[in-house]
Amino acid sequence: VAMGFALTVTYPQAGNIGGGGFMVIKTKDKVTTIDYREKAPAGSTRNMFLNEKGDFLPEKSQVGHLSAGVPGSVAGLLYALEKYGSMTREDVLAQSIRLAEDGFDMEEKLAESLNSNYDLFNKFPSARKVFTKGGLKYTAGEKFVQKDLANTLKLISVHGREGFYSGITAELIVKEMQQ
């Protein structure tokens, strides 16, 4: 669970609180899975990615606000922690909060990944703010600081699921999606 939150900070292209996932857990007595994939929003329709002729429009399902689902990562990771974990939420999230707040030296692979999506990030102000350096490309070795993410992780640390799915974080997500 701690690694899932740490990946949100250090490897956002593979792990993040805006998406979903699944987990296999092995205890002394059994093996189980948790599916916390993102879900389609309530306003979704079966034809939302089709044009007037009924042809599939892949770009609509892959890029932009219509392609987003309701995130499941926070609920799934916290469920795993509550049901199978041995640490407190605060302890599990502490290092991820520190990494996001203080930053870390960006490795070459992360810089390359972010820069490979540079044009796409620049189309969306909220993505540009996080995943570019003031609209410029990142360079390996630069400090990658994510204060807003640190604040969100703090809310999750203190309030659990409600720190993400209710309150200011949820309001900001809804506001962004409605624009």
List the model feature ranges, each with a label.
Residues A2-Q179:
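Noncatalytic scaffold domains of N-terminal-nucleophile
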